[in-house]
């Protein structure tokens, strides 16, 4: 056939590698009405899980496109379960996969998460026996963490300027960008201030409180965070029960902080949280598996709602009773 009569076929569009295709997908917030885009860290985490899923699809099903991968999300869920992953871990992985690939998470069959079955920072694990998991590997960080009770990533970004006071003149550690990009003030007790000042007086450098070497370890900082939450619950409960007027003072501080946070949320395009006096009234009663776990370990079966919310707001930045109890006070 001569060149003159040769039929030309259009070139097939090159999609790129599966990893590249996933990296180019736009990730939408779960609430489509929200004007605020998802945080960079959340999108990065979701795409990481989606790319891991893509690599699994390529290995097991020779998938080359995102659409081909979508058919195997249920297979991936079954694979994770057979691999011994916990219900919480499976949900975390699938949440990223489904959000990035735009597949409703509720269409995927997966194990039900039970908070009482969580294993993070609970019991003894092999990592706890490692030489780089004890206090001696980084005593300055360890002792500071026992008081601060923040997340590992947040220690990395502390600066020598982050020792401040809140609106009630309580000494606080300023976390400029916590989980989800939230700014938070981590309360410390006045009697703990000298120990904290000693660390701030000897920073790693002009921009970091702790060096990379100090952070390079396997210390279970989440466990120390849970211990701090338990300590502060006892602290607030004792003052509520023994000091005249302290309950009213604490409620006033919480309401002020709540309203200030709501104002910031509105300015950033988020809905305000709904306040109810029930949040600081009566006791939070454990039920179901959490109640069984508490009984097994001889822990309280109910918690003072006011003391609980104080811990959740001033020390964990979760703003919720249930998360505080299940993930911190029951972390044994």
Question: Where do the model's predicted regions map?
Answer:
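Non-catalytic DNA-binding core/recognition domains of DNA-processing enzymes
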Residues: 34-105, 303, 313-316
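Flexible interdomain linker/hinge and immediately adjacent N-terminus
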Residues: 74-78, 82, 99-134, 176-179
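Basic, Lys/Arg- and aromatic-enriched nucleic-acid-binding interface segment
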Residues: 124-152, 291-296, 303-306
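Short, charged phosphate-coordinating catalytic segments
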Residues: 145-169, 323-327
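Short, basic/aromatic-rich helical patch in the C-terminal catalytic core of site-specific tyrosine
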Residues: 155, 224-237, 312-313
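Conserved tyrosine-mediated DNA breakage-rejoining catalytic core shared by Y-recombinases
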Residues: 157-195
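Short functional hotspots where side chains directly engage DNA or cofactors
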Residues: 170-175, 279-288, 292-332
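Mixed-charge, low-complexity intrinsically disordered segments
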Residues: 235-307
């Amino acid at each position: 056939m001569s060149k003159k009569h040769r039929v030309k076929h259009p070139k097939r569009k090159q999609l790129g590698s599966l990893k590249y295709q996933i990296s180019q997908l736009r990730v939408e917030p779960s609430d489509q009405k929200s004007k605020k885009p998802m945080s960079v860290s959340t999108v990065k985490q979701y795409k990481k899980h989606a790319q891991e899923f893509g690599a699994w699809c390529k290995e097991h099903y020779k998938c080359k496109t995102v659409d081909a991968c979508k058919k195997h999300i249920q297979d991936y869920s079954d694979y994770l379960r057979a691999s011994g992953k916990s219900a919480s871990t499976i949900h975390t992985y699938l949440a990223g996969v489904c959000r990035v690939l735009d597949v409703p998470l509720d269409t995927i069959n997966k194990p039900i998460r039970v908070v009482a079955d969580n294993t993070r920072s609970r019991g003894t694990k092999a990592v706890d026996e490692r030489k780089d998991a004890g206090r001696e590997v980084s005593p300055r960080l360890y002792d500071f963490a026992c008081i601060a009770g923040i997340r590992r990533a947040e220690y990395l970004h502390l600066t020598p300027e982050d020792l401040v006071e809140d609106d009630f003149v309580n000494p606080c550690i300023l976390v400029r960008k916590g989980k989800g990009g939230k700014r938070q003030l981590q309360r410390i007790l006045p009697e703990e201030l000298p120990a904290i000042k000693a660390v701030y007086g000897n920073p790693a450098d002009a921009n970091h409180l702790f060096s990379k070497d100090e952070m390079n370890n396997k210390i279970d900082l989440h466990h120390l965070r849970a211990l701090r939450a338990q300590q502060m619950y006892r602290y607030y409960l004792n003052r509520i029960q023994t000091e005249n007027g302290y309950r009213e003072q604490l409620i006033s501080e919480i309401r002020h902080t709540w309203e200030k946070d709501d104002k910031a949320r509105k300015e950033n395009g988020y809905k305000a949280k709904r306040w109810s006096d029930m949040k600081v009234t009566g006791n939070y009663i454990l039920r179901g598996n959490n109640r069984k776990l508490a009984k097994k370990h001889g822990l309280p079966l109910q918690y003072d709602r006011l003391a609980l919310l104080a811990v959740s707001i001033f020390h964990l930045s979760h703003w919720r009773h249930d998360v505080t109890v299940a993930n911190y006070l029951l972390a044994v």
